[in-house]
Amino acid sequence: MSFNAKDMTQGGQIASMRIRMFSQIANIMLYCLFIFFWILIGLVLWVKISWQTFINGCIYWWCTSLEGMRDLIKSQPVYEIQYYGKTFRMNAAQVLHDKYMIWCGEQLWSAFVLASVVALVICLITFFVVSWILGRQGKQQSENEVTGGRQLTDNPKDVARMLKKDGKDSDIRIGDLPIIRDSEIQNFCLHGTVGAGKSEVIRRLANYARQRGDMVVIYDRSGEFVKSYYDPSIDKILNPLDARCAAWDLWKECLTQPDFDNTANTLIPMGTKEDPFWQGSGRTIFAEAAYLMRNDPNRSYSKLVDTLLSIKIEKLRTFLRNSPAANLVEEKIEKTAISIRAVLTNYVKAIRYLQGIEHNGDPFTIRDWMRGVREDQKNGWLFISSNADTHASLKPVISMWLSIAIRGLLAMGENRNRRVWFFCDELPTLHKLPDLVEILPEARKFGGCYVFGIQSYAQLEDIYGEKAAATLFDVMNTRAFFRSPSHKIAEFAAGEIGEKEHLKASEQYSYGADPVRDGVSTGKDMERQTLVSYSDIQSLPDLTCYVTLPGPYPAVKLSLKYQARPKVAPEFIPRDINPEMENRLSAVLAAREAEGRQMASLFEPEVASGEDVTQAEQPQQPQQPQQPQQPQQPQQPQQPQQPQQPVSSVINDKKSDAGVSVPAGGIEQELKMKPEEEMEQQLPPGISESGEVVDMAAYEAWQQENHPDIQQHMQRREEVNINVHRERGEDVEPGDDF
């Protein structure tokens, strides 16, 4: 409320102008309706009675109206009455008493009453119709006119009716919104921050998959899906640290050399803008070593890890002879070979968690499990799980398994009627899956249904690169956008939801003291704008999202309710691991990491200061006499059990991930290498000639004294080669050119 004189003047002028304009329209409407009313009466009378009856009835009612004044008229008028071709002359008294004239008057009156009622009803209907038409036209002038783009609705039932009318509604629903029939093979993308509701959508889709008996491969990072869906009678779990883990056999899974190459590509991800020589070489060595071990009757994961990491470089060179990897461990480039093995250690050490799972029952392969799909009965699920404590250590193995499952879909043969679901929440928490970019566009022909959850599109770009991320995102047709707190990500989501093109209405008033100056002008301007603003995305509550369907259907603002599911199985059951084997492998890994740190120092520029050179030579003096005696100690195999040697646990292995330094280049000639003899003389105390840690306390004391900051430095160097940051355009993986 405002008592300001200016506001009152403006409001009064506008109100007065509106009343005047309304009066003009009302007068025109009433005038037209009045004329229309009498026209209707005349038409009804013309249809209802004859002309003779109408004239005679009019004469009768005329005489009736003049009956009170008849005595005042000196000369009584005479009326000519028509009666079927004859003419009779009557005065007023005769007209009023003649039965025929009375009948004509009654007929005229009854016809007039009927005509009036009919005309009034028609006029009222006409009034409302005209008012509605005028109001509709006025509303259209003041409303925006949509000319293109996508629409937005907050009522999913409206879209459900549209889909049902088109015959495209599916039995799969997300809340009250059905998806388009058979669009599940066109994949799903769930985009939004943590805790916004992506997992709830996955649960809704998983419920339908379980009801229909579809085959499902699900990446369960927290064990929530194992807890809610695991059925031990038909389902399988792949988690090296879970007692229920299937006895996965690498050598039965990979039958050919390309199979081992594909496995190595995921197990050892390619670096960022660093020289890809190191990761590529590590891939080659792993693939060739695993392939050569396929015919070994005593093959095992622990033996594979020993072969790659424990034996001397000379023995590894002998094992890989006559293979493409032999050139990478040549004696001429032994220092480079040691550095390559240091890189290999960082990723292959995840294989050590598989030691012992071959005793968990019959050998299991993902390929054979997927080929066993049945369309006449319910199929099982494959849970590839981990938890927050172990995910960093198991990340290479989990990524490898999921990549094998994705490739395994193609081995099942084309079948558009089959449904194989891949649920992968928080996809960027895995290594880059190289085959995903190429397989995802073709998976629909094999019945593949991919449901990926990501916190932001930027994560996808960081892992897969700009072009590959765009390719992946483009083949995910059904999308749900949950809350995104940051401006750029929310703006991206708003742009993906869509925009509309419309003519925006505008209205302007002009008024003054003279009514001639009063007026209203309206107009429309072409405008394009997003359906929702980035602020709308930022302010979405939990379990609320915008859903876009493929095709000409509106975007839907959808609100879900959390549906609790009963716990049907423990999310995690720890597996008993051989402590002696684990301790021995931990010692091997520690030795390889120490070796990697030694090699990293060889790839650093020489120190110009004489004082630093003297300091670098100091460790040789007190420990040198003891080095030759270390390998001959009889207690050497029991060293991992000494209390001075810390044994890394299976669950908490994150610290060892940062212990290997990865050289930034792959051209040995460009690096200043130290003489081999000097390297051998500089072995720290506690390290044998074979590179094994035999006295951890002495080695740690030497490291703390001489290299107090090397661990932090090596950790930063290692993190460079893990997919944390990516410069766009530097990706060398296949599929990036899409």
UniProtKB/Swiss-Prot annotation:
Question: Which SUPFAM superfamilies does UniProt cross-reference here?
Answer: P-loop containing nucleoside triphosphate hydrolases (SSF52540)
Q: Quick one: where's region Disordered?
A: 607-690
Q: What does this protein do?
A: Conjugative DNA transfer (CDT) is the unidirectional transfer of ssDNA plasmid from a donor to a recipient cell. It is the central mechanism by which antibiotic resistance and virulence factors are propagated in bacterial populations. Couples the transferosome to a type IV secretion system. Probably forms a pore through which single-stranded plasmid DNA is transferred to the secretion system. Plasmid specificity is conferred by the TraD-TraM pair.
Q: Do you know which InterPro entries this protein is assigned to?
A: P-loop_NTPase (IPR027417), T4SS-coupling_protein (IPR051539), T4SS_TraD (IPR014128), T4SS_TraD_DNA-bd (IPR019476), TraD_N (IPR022585)
Q: Which cysteines are joined by disulfide bonds?
A: none
Q: Which Pfam families match?
A: TraD_N, TrwB_AAD_bind
**What's the name of its gene?**
traD
The protein in question is named: Coupling protein TraD
Residues binding ATP are 192-199
Where mainly found? membrane
List the top taxonomic levels of the source: Bacteria, Pseudomonadati, Pseudomonadota, Gammaproteobacteria, Enterobacterales
Q: How does it sit in the membrane?
A: Multi-pass membrane protein
Q: Where in the cell is it found?
A: Cell inner membrane
Q: Which CDD domains match?
A: TrwB_TraG_TraD_VirD4
